[in-house]
Amino acid sequence: MHSPSRAACATDPAAADSAALADTGANTRPSAHPFDHLSPQAVLDALDATGLRGDGRLLQLNSYENRVFQVMLEDGGAVVAKFYRPGRWSDAQILEEHGFAAELAAAEVPVVAPLVLGDGQTLAHALIAGQPFRLAAYPRRSGHGPELDQPDTLRWLGRFIARLHAVGEQRAFVHRRTLDAQTFGHAPLARLLDADLIPPAQLDAWRSTCQQALALVDAAFAAVPAQPLRLHGDCHPGNILWRELVETQGDSSGPHIVDLDDAVMGPAIQDLWMLLSGSPDAMRGQMAAVLQGYRQFRRFDVRELALIEPLRTLRMIHHSAWLAERWSDPAFPPAFPWFGTAGYWGQQTMQLQEQIEAMGAPPLDLDWLD
């Protein structure tokens, strides 16, 4: 019931159903997307305008939400240039993300923070083929993913995230979102239903199951008086860069945060539960190790453990809406060919039914924390 695949929120349910996507209308998209304008020369020109002169070598990195490039510079250095998805965030929201990163860096919490550009700002603007873009540049950092099967690694991550939260609780975001049942559950559900892309044969079962699951999410959030704080928001292992001493170039070794694009206000447990996988017994041991480290730097409210499965449920629903809303981006259909198929929605219904069962079971038992 607590398999690692549920954290991923979407797997290929039935490749044979890919043809059904045409019947949903989900594969229709404009002939041009704003990111289509980001030619190599356009990327280099935009960076050049900020004072970062590329030598002509660049490599597009793996990112679906934004477009990210490693760019070699004339001075022998390298940066990672991030072009934000047009229309997703405002300047104020991005600057809150950058400000949070700067606060973390000032508190010596390892984070790959955006560079201050030639005009003294971390956020730049470029007009490319009539399309406005927001962009930022980051130092290039190497490393690898954390070894989550090691208790010492989990304890280290607990200490690291507690330090991040100690900074996060000092003030609130004003412009960025709050992770709650409305923003990440009910609103995505409404958008999916309005999009009219779920095949009729799967619609009633999925909608009914989703509504039942959200009723349990609502009840869980009402029962746990969690104090929201600034979070990483998407703290899965892929967003944690583990750096060894030989790789640090003067930085600290251990975990580094590399992406605050999804930073939100929310409960502390949101930045912890995605480190867990396996059976309930396995997750209990993993969370015990994480919290042994976490509580060295910050108090943890054990009642938030009851939000793990509700938060997993919100992530599943939000992920489906995210795919639907990004389908006009040419990068998405080849990467997620199963999305929108009858098999996909059937699998989502089954996974939501599993979540209903999981939310009805007792939360992780870590009574020793009281």
State each model region's role:
Residues H2-D12, D17-G54:
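Juxta-kinase regulatory segment immediately upstream of eukaryotic protein kinase catalytic domains
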Residues T50-M72:
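ATP-binding glycine-rich phosphate-binding loop
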Residues E65-G76, V80-A81, P114-V116, A215-L272, ...:
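Active-site acidic catalytic loop and adjacent metal/ATP-binding pocket
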Residues E74-F173:
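ATP-binding pocket architecture of kinase catalytic cores
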Residues P86, G120, Q131-L148, L189-I198, ...:
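A glycine-centered beta->alpha junction motif in the catalytic cores
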Residues P146-D204, P228, F336-W338:
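A cross-family kinase active-site recognition segment
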Residues A268-R299, R315-A331:
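Active-site activation/catalytic loop segments of kinase-like enzymes and analogous catalytic loops
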Residues A321-D370:
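ATP/Mg2+ or Mg2+-diphosphate-binding catalytic cores
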